[in-house]
Amino acid sequence: MTNLRKTHPLMKIINNSFIDLPAPSNISSWWNFGSLLGICLIVQILTGLFLAMHYTSDTTTAFSSVTHICRDVNYGWLIRYLHANGASMFFICLFLHVGRGIYYGSYMFLETWNIGVLLLFAVMATAFMGYVLPWGQMSFWGATVITNLLSAIPYIGTDLVEWIWGGFSVDKATLTRFFAFHFILPFIVAALAGVHLLFLHETGSNNPSGLPSDADKIPFHPYYTIKDILGVLLFILILTSLVLFSPDLLGDPDNYTPANPLNTPPHIKPEWYFLFAYAILRSIPNKLGGVLALVLSILVLAVIPLLHTSKQRSMMFRPFSQCLFWILVADLLTLTWIGGQPVEHPFIIIGQLASILYFLLILVLMPIASLLENNLLKW
């Protein structure tokens, strides 16, 4: 068996990726989220596949088909809520994974990091289109509002929006194409994740100290396989608790009302994991400016490696940078809260200040703090 594992062309790839992979001996539980994201993707693809067997992407029957899944299909309610809450778990793991990358300087692996940013965009696009499919009120109006933002693009904006809609409003054509894209994108995400791993294994994993770990490597199996299994068990515990005890905790009650183009909900807002970006979008009074800020709020991740001014890789031994990092985390939580609030005083000004602070921290304050730390260490 050992021989086959190391000689068979397919088994060799698996062996070099998950069994005999040399891994740093000191990577903490913050390194568990990569495997958890893989599990999330598998759960989403499987539950999504079973949902697609019963779902109809037609405006007249989409809402009814989701109701039918929940009421009449064996364990349909379980599959539906695993899929919906699985998306929330996916984003929790994503945010923690990206946060880990920023804290420990993993972004210095440029190829891996850039593919990761691309993956983040792809997953966000997938989640947005998936939210439209149940064809509830928030599905319809969320799709209308977010796609309409593209009309802010000069000259081609209006034509672009109508081209995406497949008509003059969000309708049957829009729903059908969103279903098609929502089905295909996770497989593209899986392929990109493979490339992400390929690039990572070219360099090997980073570790909390940010120092080279070539002198102290251990095999991935059994040490990190057992550690990943513990992470997966905790993940399953949280996901099943969420699904079985409060499946609608993170959803919007408006989505239990069928889509009605003649009736606008009082507060249109996306799912919780987009609220921070939505808050940044709303904090700018100009439409095009808001759209640019929205895109840049994620795209700013791609410039983080260029702004690394510290002589150390990780933040483990940099208290100033640590303080700014946790202020950034608090700021993102503030933006998430603001994104779910109505557009009125004092939420408007809080959102604007939090948006300014977000970009200021990443683009200005953190690079300056790194230079200051270099100076204090006389480097």
Curated annotation (Swiss-Prot):
Subunit-level organization: The cytochrome bc1 complex contains 11 subunits: 3 respiratory subunits (MT-CYB, CYC1 and UQCRFS1), 2 core proteins (UQCRC1 and UQCRC2) and 6 low-molecular weight proteins (UQCRH/QCR6, UQCRB/QCR7, UQCRQ/QCR8, UQCR10/QCR9, UQCR11/QCR10 and a cleavage product of UQCRFS1). This cytochrome bc1 complex then forms a dimer.
Disulfide bonds: none
Pfam families linked to this entry: Cytochrom_B_C, Cytochrome_B
Protein name: Cytochrome b
Mutagenesis or variant effect for I39T: In strain: Isolate SO-03/2/17-2
PANTHER family (alphabetical): CYTOCHROME B
GO-annotated biological processes: mitochondrial electron transport, ubiquinol to cytochrome c
Reported cofactor(s): heme b
Organismal lineage: Eukaryota, Metazoa, Chordata, Craniata, Vertebrata
Gene: MT-CYB
UniProt-annotated binding residues for a ubiquinone: H201
Family, as annotated: Belongs to the cytochrome b family.
Keyword annotations of the record: Electron transport, Heme, Iron, Membrane, Metal-binding, Mitochondrion, Mitochondrion inner membrane, Respiratory chain, Transmembrane, Transmembrane helix, Transport, Ubiquinone
Binding site for heme b b562: H83, H182
Topology of this chain in the membrane: Multi-pass membrane protein
Effect of K6T: In strain: Isolate SO-03/2/17-2
TM region(s), chain numbering: 33-53, 77-98, 113-133, 178-198, 226-246, 288-308, 320-340, 347-367
Record-linked CDD domains: cytochrome_b_C, Cytochrome_b_N
Cofactor remark from the record: Binds 2 heme b groups non-covalently.
Compartments where located: Mitochondrion inner membrane
GO MF, one example: metal ion binding
